[in-house]
């Protein structure tokens, strides 16, 4: 009986043993879980093709380049598995035959020759380092079993690919391939695959950059085994043995540092894949370094390149030199808020085209103006009188742009830009005003480049794509026709050529901007495929006298454009939209008139949007007699008379807006254009027949303040002439409209006073204030 019980107990014990082992293993697994995530984070930012841009090592200075199995050459996987662990895909974590072989070798030699570790066991040791003792080997085997229970073979292999040591601060095949060979691990040759497969066995002793002879011998050993096992042919192995151990110049990735720093905050991934083109980025950074010597002291630059066909950012240079503290090299000026100067002007003209306010040949007024305390002027400090919209844009004149913005509405303009991703930054509490169009608000270069894509994307502004998986998002800014017209004007092709003469591929269209005080110089260009954004200036905001958009930013823009064109093929065409047609309009009215019509003082060919011919845009104060359609009353002899004269008949004549009179040839001024006045029933009273004269100060007079006076008071009178008076002091309009004016002068210097009447007669006087 006791014997029977003993037998039964043995059978029960044997039957329960697997269950007990399972419970023990399960408990141990819970008590000592795998440290899968216990690693200091090391991150890398890469270009779209996988080229490393910038590495961010972990706290221990370790650099990793995360890869998947698909990212690695099959040659490397063949060499690794067949040299290190032929039975990797079949064993449960440890290979008993390998362990037995290693134990026999160690015993017979009296020293450790082989550890018999499988790839899984090597991963186990990487995750949980342990001493090379018998107990350590048991612990390693236990961790290997845990790996096999929790992970698939592919996951275990991926861990090895990313955690294996390759010498120095390099971990993983990705980091090793880029650091030693300057190439992706997907493109390894047989020789390179063999060398990197054996390197983790003794990374310090076999480092190819320090011990190329040792690395070559170890590589050849791997190659020979691949031939013996029939994995690679003898011919392949022979050719590979003849290859020298070639290494790329060992240099950690150093491209797009400020962009890479920004991307760390936009992605949690250890490997952040971006849309940058590594080759282009390298060219841009070389250009920046070469340009550094041309910049004034403490100045920097910024460049951004956007492929407007898919909105991917292809190049980003945030400063001229990251390591130059005197130039604030650590400040990324691509996303800094700066005054854009005149760079916004194309947008207001395009929006005004869609609104039906203007067409490209619309007559605008480049004349002195004052709106409250705001007195805009031009960059060259002069005024040009009558000018077309297209010429005003090409010459970047300020007063015409202010005139159009006033008609469109500054608040509406700012809201339109904000809606497509171009916010304008105003001082706290400030509302959008007319100064917006001249740089009176801040903007970012990256946002400006994104908005300029509207001129190449049929009027739709896209959102910049920084990573390949970012969705393509866009919003309408203006019509396709308006975008096409403005782009052609910026390319200096405003003339409406026949379709056969239009270039199929759009030339470079560009616009400059210079902020107040020469603090910022901008240039934005749009070519057939790319939008290029350029900024130069001092990051601290101090002025750089003489540095303006055309002189400082345009040469750099042209250099970048040449680089892009040398790399581009099959550029997209830019056909004329059906909404854009050719037309001929007349000045000063702005619309078509028949041949021979006396109201057509000048004919201009132009592009028209949807066939629209809006009349000339007037300033808010230009109504009635001060506008273009001028009413006159004629007697039976064709002479001008007052409206209430007997038998007076009314006619309408097109005249130029009064503020343009000083810039018109004599034959176009009202005094010549209007029929002579009747002496019997004069239109403005009898004194209107007298010439316009100025009295109160003689020409060339010297004016001095009375002792103790803060200003000199100068009363002036006009006589003769007709209708209202328009007064200008040094080209700036005065608010008075009467026959007399009193000047209050405080500043010394030369002065010119001009008075004009409603029929265009002019009287002037010059004097000096001392």
Predicted regions and their residues:
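Conserved catalytic neighborhood of penicillin-recognizing serine enzymes
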Residues: 108-132, 186, 249-265, 358-413, ...
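Active-site SXXK
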Residues: 80-81, 226, 284, 311, ...
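Glycine-rich, acidic and aromatic/proline-enriched surface loops and short helix-turn segments
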Residues: 125-129, 162-169, 186, 190-202, ...
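Soluble, non-transmembrane domains of envelope/secretory-pathway proteins that act on or interact
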Residues: 2-7, 15, 232, 508-770
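Mid-domain, small-residue-enriched loop/turn segments at the edges of structured enzyme/sensor domains
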Residues: 375-378, 409-452
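Short, well-structured active-site flanking segments
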Residues: 89-99, 171-174, 234-236, 327, ...
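A penicillin-recognizing enzyme superfamily signal
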Residues: 274-295, 305, 316-319, 324-333, ...
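Juxtamembrane regions of bacterial inner-membrane/periplasmic proteins
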Residues: 2-297, 308-314, 319, 367, ...
């Amino acid at each position: 009986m006791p014997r029977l019980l003993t037998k039964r107990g043995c059978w029960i014990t044997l039957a329960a043993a697997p269950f007990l082992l399972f419970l023990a293993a399960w408990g141990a697994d819970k008590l000592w879980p795998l440290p899968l995530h216990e690693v200091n984070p090391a991150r890398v930012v890469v270009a779209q093709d996988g080229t490393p841009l910038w590495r961010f090592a972990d706290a221990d200075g370790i650099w990793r380049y995360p890869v998947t199995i698909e990212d690695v050459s099959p040659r490397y996987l063949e060499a690794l598995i067949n040299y290190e662990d032929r039975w990797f895909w079949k064993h449960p974590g440890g290979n008993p035959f390998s362990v037995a072989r290693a134990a026999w070798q160690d015993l017979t030699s009296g020293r450790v020759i082989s550890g018999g570790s499988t790839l899984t066991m090597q991963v186990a040791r990487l995750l949980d380092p342990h001493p090379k003792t018998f107990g350590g080997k048991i612990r390693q085997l236990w961790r290997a079993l845990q790996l096999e229970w929790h992970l698939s073979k592919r996951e275990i292999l991926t861990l090895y690919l990313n955690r294996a040591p390759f010498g120095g601060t390099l971990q993983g095949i990705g980091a090793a391939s880029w650091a030693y060979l300057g190439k992706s691990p997907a493109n390894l040759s047989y020789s390179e695959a063999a060398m990197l497969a054996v390197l983790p066995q003794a990374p310090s002793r076999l480092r190819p950059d320090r011990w190329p002879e040792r690395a070559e011998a170890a590589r050849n050993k791997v190659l020979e085994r691949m031939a013996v096992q029939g994995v690679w042919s003898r011919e392949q192995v022979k050719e590979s043995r003849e290859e020298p151990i070639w290494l790329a110049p060992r240099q950690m990735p150093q491209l797009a540092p400020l962009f890479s720093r920004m991307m760390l905050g936009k992605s949690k991934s250890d490997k952040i894949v971006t849309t940058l083109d590594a080759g282009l980025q390298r060219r841009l950074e070389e250009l920046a370094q070469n340009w550094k010597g041309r910049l004034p002291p403490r100045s920097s630059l910024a460049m951004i390149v956007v492929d407007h066909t898919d909105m991917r950012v292809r190049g980003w240079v945030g400063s001229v030199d990251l390591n130059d503290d005197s130039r604030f090299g650590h400040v990324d000026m691509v996303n800094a808020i700066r005054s854009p100067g005149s760079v916004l002007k194309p947008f207001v003209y395009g929006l005004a085209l869609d609104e039906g306010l203007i067409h490209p040949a619309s007559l605008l007024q480049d004349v002195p103006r004052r709106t409250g305390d705001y007195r805009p002027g031009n960059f060259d400090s002069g005024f040009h009188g009558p000018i077309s919209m297209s010429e005003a844009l090409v010459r970047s004149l300020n007063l015409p742009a202010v005139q159009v913005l006033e008609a469109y509405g500054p608040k509406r303009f700012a809201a339109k830009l904000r809606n497509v991703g171009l916010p304008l930054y105003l001082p706290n509490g400030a509302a959008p005003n007319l100064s917006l169009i001249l740089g009176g608000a801040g903007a970012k270069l990256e946002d400006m480049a994104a908005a300029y894509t509207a001129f190449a994307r049929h009027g739709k502004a896209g959102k910049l794509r920084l990573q390949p998986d970012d969705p393509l998002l866009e919003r309408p800014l203006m019509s396709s026709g308006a975008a096409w017209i403005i782009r052609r004007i910026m390319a200096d092709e405003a003339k409406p050529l026949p379709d056969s003469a239009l270039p199929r591929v759009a030339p470079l269209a560009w616009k400059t901007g210079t902020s107040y005080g020469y603090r910022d110089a901008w240039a934005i260009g749009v070519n057939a495929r790319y939008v290029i954004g350029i900024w130069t200036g001092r990051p601290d905001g101090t002025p750089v006298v003489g540095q303006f958009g055309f002189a400082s930013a345009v040469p750099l823009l042209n250099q970048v454009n040449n680089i892009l064109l040398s790399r581009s093929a099959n550029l997209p065409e830019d056909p004329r939209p059906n909404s854009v047609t050719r037309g001929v309009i007349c000045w000063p009215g702005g619309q078509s008139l028949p041949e021979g019509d006396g109201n057509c003082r000048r004919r201009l060919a132009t592009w028209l949007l949807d066939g629209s011919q809006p009349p000339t845009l007037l300033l808010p104060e230009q109504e009635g007699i001060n506008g273009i359609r001028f009413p006159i009353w004629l007697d039976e002899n064709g002479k001008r008379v007052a409206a209430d004269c007997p038998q007076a008949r009314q006619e309408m004549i097109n005249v130029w807006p009064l503020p343009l009179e000083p810039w018109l040839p004599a034959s176009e001024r009202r005094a010549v254009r209007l029929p002579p006045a009747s002496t019997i029933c004069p239109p403005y009273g009898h004194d209107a027949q007298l010439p316009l004269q100025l009295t109160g100060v003689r020409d060339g007079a010297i004016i001095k303040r009375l002792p103790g006076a803060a200003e000199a008071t100068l009363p002036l009178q006009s006589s003769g002439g007709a209708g209202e008076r328009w007064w200008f002091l040094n080209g700036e309009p005065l608010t008075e409209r009467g026959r007399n004016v009193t000047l209050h002068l405080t500043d010394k210097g030369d002065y010119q006073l001009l008075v004009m009447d409603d029929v265009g007669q002019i009287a002037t006087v010059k004097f000096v204030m001392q």
